[in-house]
């Protein structure tokens, strides 16, 4: 059975989480889902990182086809993305659980 690797970058504000995500995305060639792709692209450029694809929240939930192979992605701010998806369906996120396993 193949082990599924999921990166979780958990740290305080202003600690470099997003820059670490940029480096992972660049190295792996995996796009990043984010609220504002243009702002994120400019932020990556300011760190000297280019060649990353960014996908908006809206594009992430509407693009693709169920028959397509699942595409690997990173998500910047998973809480915000979850909130966005739930709000689209008239739900309001009030809490969640997360495992601290590697």
Language-model features, listed with the residues they occupy:
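Conserved RecA-like ASCE ATPase "motif II neighborhood" in helicase/translocase motors
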Residues: 50-94
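Ser/Thr/Gly-rich flexible loops in soluble cytosolic domains mediating phosphotransfer, phosphorylation
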Residues: 94-102
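Conserved P-loop
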Residues: 4-65
């Amino acid at each position: 059975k193949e082990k599924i690797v999921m990166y979780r970058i958990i740290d305080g504000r202003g600690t470099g989480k997003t820059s670490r995500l940029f480096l992972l995305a660049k190295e792996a060639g995996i796009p990043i889902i984010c609220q504002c792709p243009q702002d994120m692209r400019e932020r990556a450029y300011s760190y000297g990182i280019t060649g990353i694809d960014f996908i908006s929240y809206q594009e992430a939930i509407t693009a693709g086809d169920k028959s397509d192979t699942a595409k690997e992605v990173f998500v910047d701010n998973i809480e915000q993305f979850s909130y966005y998806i739930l709000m689209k369906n008239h739900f309001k996120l009030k809490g969640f659980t997360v495992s601290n396993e590697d």
